[in-house]
Swiss-Prot record:
The gene is MIH. Disulfide bonds join C42-C79, C59-C75, C62-C88. GO terms for biological process: circadian rhythm; neuropeptide signaling pathway. It is found in: Secreted. This is Molt-inhibiting hormone. Its main location: secreted. It comes from Charybdis feriata (Crucifix crab).
Length: 113
């Protein structure tokens, strides 16, 4: 027969186990969500997140200037390898950086099919 103290200890242990399991699941899903923040179209993103953020800044600025719904996503399409991205570079008056930005886009899109 189980005493009241043993029963309470067993219940506490069960709750502790449940909390640990839920924390592990939450942590895992949070990590996956953070990884999805970055563009899935860019195959060479790992190790080049600093380049990605610099190139993405152009799209964010463009979206802020024109306030067109989905403009930032259109600019990021195909890992920035599109005419809309080039248009945004011109619209944000960063044409002097065009060659550098194109090089970064090629690095990010290396291996893209």
């Amino acid at each position: 027969m189980m005493s009241r103290a043993n029963s309470r200890f067993s219940c506490q242990r069960t709750w502790l186990l449940a909390v640990v399991v839920l924390a592990a699941i939450w942590s895992s899903s949070l990590h996956q969500a953070a990884a999805r923040v970055f563009n899935d179209d860019c195959p060479n993103l790992m190790g080049n997140r600093d380049l990605y953020k610099k190139v993405e800044w152009i799209c964010d600025d463009c979206a802020n200037i024109f306030r067109i719904p989905g403009m930032a996503s259109i600019c990021r399409k195909d890992c920035f390898f599109n005419e809309d991205f080039l248009w945004c570079v011109r619209a944000t008056e960063r044409t002097e950086e065009m060659m550098q930005l194109k090089q970064w886009v090629r690095i990010l899109g290396a291996g893209r099919m």
